[in-house]
Amino acid sequence: MADNEELINNNFPSIRCRYCGQRNQVRPDAGEARCGRCRLRLSDAPHKKFAHLDKEEYIHPADRRALAALRAIPGIDTALKKLLAVTGESAIRVIFTASAVKVTPTQCPDLYAKLQIACTTLGVDMPELFVQQNPVVNAFTGGVERPVIVLYSQLIERLSDEEVLAVVAHEVGHIHAEHVLYLTAARLIEFLAKTAVLASPLASIVKDLLTMSMRAALLAWARRAELSCDRAALLVTQDANVIGRTMMKLSGGTFASRVDYDQFLAQARDFQKNYDEKALDRFWADVITSGLSHPFPVWRVSEILRWVETGEYRALMTAPESAAA
């Protein structure tokens, strides 16, 4: 059992949380020890915090290529700026202030601690975090000047504390990677495309933005941006299995408790092998995901495994201390 620092009993050993720094007393007979503040597992292993992390050190090559293709579309920046100038961030802030629970140091403090861990590790100013009731296992980041992160309640209920940290870190990764302008536009376009907007003041702007080339390019980039932020999540959790298990739950839903994790990883490797070697598999994977905002969870796992197995992740984690705190 973990208690607040001021309640530490000298009769029991204490462990300082590697993630948030909270000092916890641990009863020898209490079973798995977790931090009383962030609820993450206690361990004496180190946790690296990056003082000067450059986004280019972890941005996925596919993200970089898709963003270049998006920016090359004539008029894209003008159209997006018009849309965001009209909607601004007020709509996002009003919606979630009115319909969701704002996370603070005293409201859902373990979630606040997880946000603080992710921001401290990546070197990002803390955005506002909200929890909204929703049966979908999902989260998203919106806004530009003052981004907000929203976690759906079902996600918190379904995932472990470490997996929730991974999701929070993924969303913070969007901020660190400077995705928020295009990401907010992509999500807004996706929403407007599903809504009766023809009679709204945004009609002319929406018509401009919903050209096939712009929509396709935005969705293509948004899918690949997720791969970069999965890497950011790994830089925070510092455990590839946490990322893998999170994706397994996104794939299997409530059935995930009956899924063998090792076989799921083997499935991810098999998918990557076929994608790399078989043109037809690659064609169908690209066609099926072309209308989606997120890549397949199995593909995301295979990409994280590849990043780890190529040694790129380890190289970043073992960089000289001059680049990390």
Description of each model-found segment:
Residues 1-142, 215-218, 254-255, 274-286, ...:
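Hydrophobic or amphipathic, alpha-helical segments that drive membrane association/targeting
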Residues 7, 99, 106-112, 118-124, ...:
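Short helix/loop segments within enzyme catalytic domains
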Residues 106, 151-166:
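Short pre-active-site segment immediately N-terminal to the catalytic Zn-binding motif
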Residues 115, 151, 229, 296:
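Residue-level signature of catalytic and energy-coupling elements of molecular machines
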Residues 159, 168-177, 228, 232:
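Active-site His/Glu-centered metal-binding helix of metallohydrolases
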Residues 172-191, 200:
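Catalytic Zn2+-binding segment of zinc metalloproteases
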Residues 188-192, 246-253, 304-307, 319:
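Short acidic/histidine-centered micro-motifs embedded in hydrophobic/aromatic stretches
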